[in-house]
């Protein structure tokens, strides 16, 4: 089922009515608000929607509106007879899925907008966290719609606490509470206390007289008197100046919300300097306002001309995973609670010389998760680039200490791969070869040697390892494989002819660089498997394995001029050069495994994790290192310490969110949450599941690999990469993928796809919680665009 956009129209003011508890008067409030709208000629027609109702039909809330607000359109989507919570009442019926409920609500509101309705209320059942039919909290069930809230507070004893708790639960989930109403009670005076509380939040609170009490007798005369009393009550409250003023306020807020979204792009163009963006020729129309985000989707503002009756927000699949950060979905309430808990417990506290529980627990959990016996220490930084700066400092210090080099007198280089990218801070920029990213950076120097390498792709339905033409004399020709699992059978391939060729080429190259050119190298730095920003370059895992093996197995290459080679102290000591893995992008389940190093059978001496570390919520980075690397900075001298840090180092909010994110992802791995995806990639006569798999279907890859415009495709974990043919050459400056990006952005009537391109490569990336149904829908759009 296609996702729904959040609910926003120019002409229709739609609000959701939540209660601080059950039996606080939600339907009473809905009735007099609709009656007041009907009475005021400038408010348009009113409508009332009850998505889920429980209890006898003659007591249903929509029936109450039909009786006491006869000029209001009413509708109930799902009625269950038993007067209990919806998740219990629905058990004896065919339970509608949450997405079906959302679609029905959105479709009903859209129909009403087209019919000229000006005011609509969507009333929930029970309290804020009362379960829906599938057992999920209503606050989460309806969150994709993000309707502005009218909160009915509780005027009874204990109502102050329940009302504030209800408000905070809504706020935590990203709802906007536009107004609060409750019944006056001169004894408990909750309206006085809550009025002051919500005034401090700039939220109007309207106290109204309590409705007449229901008669205890249920004879016809008593019921008739009750109905008459209610009619008089509604007639009185409807005319209240406070109620009329509230309706005017709701009109204004809807108008202001639409106007703000209207202006956001043009205002941003005037004030925002965007990263990785050439602003020359950039217009306001090129900027997409995002009103909110939930799960895999942005809610983007439609800037194209639309009538007042058409919805203004559209669901947009976050195809770049918001620069590769998304793991557990946007607006994740669990992570929001984690952040709020840590913010409430700590705020931010100084880290050096101190320790707090989230930082310690995360460090221990991360070391256990990556399961690399070399790694024993965790250094915290703010983002991937700074984490790699720290890794570089660690590696170079260890190498210089072992080999007796003075980096102030001679240049110490790194070994890496062409197309690598490790961040935008100046040190790690020098760890990449000259490119579009750095050629206009004034302090860039480029200190290293970067190996070209064979690429993995599927073309014409066949997995291939494609060797650059300039290397075929040394590495041999292209190879074909029966499956992606076969490509990753590194332990077998390392003994093959290709493995021997790779090692010989790497060894001879390093010998030439050191002996003939006199270069010194202090670290081997690699992005395991996929070089992301360089163009989603899928490196042959065998080549990376051989590179690490040659560096570690030939320490004599790097100690030229030293009489004796300091031998590693243990089997876990680094040898040759410290091996640094930049897993900022590829680590922590992005490629379907806890660590992308496991694909290579290589345990790095230093590893950096960032993007998925916090599930996609806040910045945080860890640089993991061995004790031997750590000891290179240990001495009586302060100057020998790792003098690097940030004001918000190991901030408690990020550490707590990361701890809970890591726990969630580990649980998903253990409980088989991805088994359906794995089974899709299982080969005939293979084991239970594929060793290498993707959330993107194998059939999609096979289909796209035959497309006329496609040079090659691959998918692994949550990453899908499509390389398009370009007669003028591939690379970051290519525009070949722009056309496909434009077609995806156009999407369909219900949703579209946001994506990023890297030259001739368009990639899509899901979260680790993406549903198979959602991704197969996206795949359908891709097929339409390319086949």
From Swiss-Prot:
It holds the Pfam family Aminotran_3. The keyword Protein transport does not apply. Pyridoxal 5'-phosphate binds at residues 384-385, 582, 646-647. Substrate binds at residue 54. Pathway: Cofactor biosynthesis; biotin biosynthesis; biotin from 7,8-diaminononanoate: step 1/2; Cofactor biosynthesis; biotin biosynthesis; 7,8-diaminononanoate from 8-amino-7-oxononanoate (SAM route): step 1/1. Its EC number is 6.3.3.3, 2.6.1.62. ATP binds at residues 23-28, 123-126, 184-185. This is Bifunctional dethiobiotin synthetase/adenosylmethionine-8-amino-7-oxononanoate aminotransferase. It comes from Emericella nidulans (strain FGSC A4 / ATCC 38163 / CBS 112.46 / NRRL 194 / M139). The lineage of its organism: Eukaryota, Fungi, Dikarya, Ascomycota, Pezizomycotina.
């Amino acid at each position: 089922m296609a996702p729904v956009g959040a609910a926003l129209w120019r002409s229709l003011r739609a609000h959701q009515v939540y209660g601080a508890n059950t039996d606080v008067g939600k339907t009473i409030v809905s009735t007099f608000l609709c009656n007041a709208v009907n009475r005021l000629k400038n408010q348009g027609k009113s409508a009332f929607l009850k998505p889920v109702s429980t209890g006898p039909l003659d007591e249903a809330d929509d029936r109450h509106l039909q009786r006491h607000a006869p000029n209001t359109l009413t509708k109930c989507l799902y009625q269950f007879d038993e007067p209990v919570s919806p998740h219990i009442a629905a058990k004896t019926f065919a339970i509608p899925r949450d997405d079906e409920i959302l679609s029905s609500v959105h479709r009903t509101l859209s129909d009403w907008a087209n019919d000229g309705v000006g005011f609509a209320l969507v009333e929930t059942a029970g309290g804020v966290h009362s379960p829906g039919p599938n057992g999920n909290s209503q606050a989460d069930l309806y969150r994709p719609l993000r309707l502005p809230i009218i909160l009915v507070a509780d005027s009874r004893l204990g109502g102050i606490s329940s009302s504030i708790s209800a408000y905070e639960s809504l706020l935590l989930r990203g709802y906007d509470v536009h107004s609060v109403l409750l019944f006056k009670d001169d004894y408990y005076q909750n309206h006085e206390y809550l009025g002051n509380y919500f005034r401090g939040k700039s939220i109007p609170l309207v106290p109204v007289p309590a409705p007449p009490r229901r008669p205890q007798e249920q004879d016809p005369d008593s019921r008739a008197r009750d109905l008459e009393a209610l009619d008089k009550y509604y007639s009185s409250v409807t005319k209240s100046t406070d109620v009329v003023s509230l309706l005017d306020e709701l009109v204004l807020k809807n108008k202001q919300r639409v106007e703000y979204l209207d202006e956001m792009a043009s205002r941003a163009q005037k004030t925002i300097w965007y990263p990785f963006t050439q602003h020359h020729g950039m217009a306001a129309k090129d900027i997409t306002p995002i009103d909110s985000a939930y799960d895999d989707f942005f809610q983007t503002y439609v800037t194209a001309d639309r009538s007042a009756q058409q919805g203004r927000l559209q669901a947009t699949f976050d195809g770049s995973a918001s620069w590769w950060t998304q793991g557990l979905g946007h607006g994740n309430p669990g992570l929001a609670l984690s952040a709020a808990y840590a913010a409430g417990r700590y705020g931010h506290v100084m880290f050096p010389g101190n320790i707090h529980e989230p930082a310690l627990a995360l460090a221990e959990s991360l070391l256990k998760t990556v399961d690399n016996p070399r790694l024993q220490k965790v250094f915290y930084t703010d983002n991937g680039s700074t984490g790699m700066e720290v890794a570089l400092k660690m590696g170079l210090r260890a190498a210089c200490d072992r080999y007796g080099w003075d980096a102030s007198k001679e240049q110490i280089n790194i070994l890496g791969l062409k197309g690598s990218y490790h961040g935008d801070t100046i040190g790690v920029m020098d760890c990449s070869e000259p490119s579009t990213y750095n050629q206009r950076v004034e302090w860039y120097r480029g200190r290293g040697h970067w190996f070209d390498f064979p690429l993995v792709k599927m073309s014409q339905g066949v997995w291939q390892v494609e060797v650059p033409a300039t290397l075929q004399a040394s590495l041999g020709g292209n190879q074909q494989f029966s499956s992606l699992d076969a490509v990753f059978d590194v332990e077998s391939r390392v003994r093959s002819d290709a493995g021997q060729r790779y090692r010989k080429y790497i060894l001879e190259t390093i010998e030439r660089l050191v002996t003939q050119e006199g270069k010194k190298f202090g670290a081997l730095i690699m992005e395991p498997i996929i070089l992301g920003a360089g163009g989603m370059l899928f490196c042959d895992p065998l080549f990376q394995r051989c590179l690490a093996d040659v560096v570690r197995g030939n320490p004599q290459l790097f100690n030229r001029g030293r009489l004796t080679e300091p031998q590693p102290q243990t089997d876990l000591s680094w040898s040759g050069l410290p091996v640094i893995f930049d897993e900022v992008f590829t680590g922590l389940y992005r490629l379907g495994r806890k660590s992308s190093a496991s694909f290579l059978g290589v345990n790095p001496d230093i590893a950096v994790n960032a993007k998925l570390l916090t599930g996609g919520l806040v910045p945080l980075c860890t640089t993991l290192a061995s004790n031997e690397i750590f000891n290179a900075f240990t001495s009586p001298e302060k100057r020998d310490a790792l003098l690097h840090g940030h004001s918000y180092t190991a901030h408690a909010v990020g550490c707590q969110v990361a701890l809970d994110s890591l726990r969630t992802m580990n649980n998903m791995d253990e409980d088989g949450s991805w088994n359906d995806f794995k089974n899709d990639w299982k080969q005939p006569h293979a084991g239970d599941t594929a060793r290498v798999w993707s959330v993107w279907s194998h059939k999609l890859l096979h289909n796209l690999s035959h497309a006329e415009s496609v040079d090659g495709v691959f998918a692994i974990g949550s990453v899908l990469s499509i390389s398009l043919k370009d007669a003028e050459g591939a690379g970051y400056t290519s525009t070949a993928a722009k056309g496909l990006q434009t077609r995806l952005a156009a999407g369909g009537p219900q949703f579209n796809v946001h994506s990023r391109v890297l030259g001739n490569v368009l990639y899509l990336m899901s979260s680790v919680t993406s549903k198979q149904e959602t991704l197969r829908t996206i795949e359908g759009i891709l097929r339409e665009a390319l086949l």
